[in-house]
């Protein structure tokens, strides 16, 4: 698949995520929600989903990485899709996706936060931003919510 395939995958996942919503989840619950939502999207698109997949080679920093999700189409056709789901702007996550793209995978980075992304995103990776709202309760718990149409 060409770069158009990468754009198509990103558009499709964004559209799926824009139909999702949740309220009052903890940070770990939000990450689990998005990981499960991506897995549901992938299954709906005909992909087999693997979680926590080790990259076959070390990154430039000589670290072996694990991708949050890796998708393989059930037909056996097309390229693998590698996905990272993060709240923060982790250079390590981006490095893993760059390596996956160098291996020929489509690379998607789902980042959930309202804070801006401060790293330059290479042309081989597509960033999907989920605009998650955060509030602090009287007990100082930080709870997160997502409304429909807040993923771009």
Q: Where in this protein do the model-derived segments appear?
A:
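Helix-adjacent hinge/juxtasegments
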Residues: 50, 55-72
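Domain-level recognition of nuclease-like catalytic cores that cleave nucleotide substrates
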Residues: 61, 113-152
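Short acidic, S/G/P-rich loop/turn micro-motifs used as interaction or catalytic elements
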Residues: 87-90, 114-116
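A short acidic, amphipathic alpha-helical/loop segment
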Residues: 93-100
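Acidic-basic catalytic patches of nuclease active cores, encompassing PD-(D/E)XK
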Residues: 1-57
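Hydrophobic beta-strand segments of well-ordered beta-sheets in folded domains
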Residues: 80-82, 104-111
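Short glycine/proline-enriched coil/turn segments at helix->beta-strand junctions
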Residues: 45-46, 101-106
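Conserved catalytic cores of phosphodiester-cleaving nucleases, focusing on short active-site segments
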Residues: 67-87
């Amino acid at each position: 698949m060409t770069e158009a395939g990468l754009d198509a995958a990103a558009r499709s996942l964004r559209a799926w995520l824009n139909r999702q919503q949740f309220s009052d989840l903890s940070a770990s619950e939000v990450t689990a929600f998005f990981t499960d939502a991506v897995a549901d999207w992938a299954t709906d698109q005909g992909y087999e989903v693997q979680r926590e997949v080790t990259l076959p080679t070390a990154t430039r920093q000589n670290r072996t990485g694990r991708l949050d999700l890796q998708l393989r189409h059930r037909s056996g056709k097309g390229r693998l899709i590698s996905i990272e789901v993060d709240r923060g702007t982790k250079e390590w996550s981006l490095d893993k996706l760059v390596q996956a793209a160098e291996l020929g995978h489509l690379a998607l980075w789902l980042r959930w936060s309202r804070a801006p992304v401060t790293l330059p995103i290479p042309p081989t990776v597509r960033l999907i931003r989920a605009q998650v709202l955060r509030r602090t309760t009287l007990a100082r718990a930080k709870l997160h919510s997502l409304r429909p149409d807040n993923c771009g």
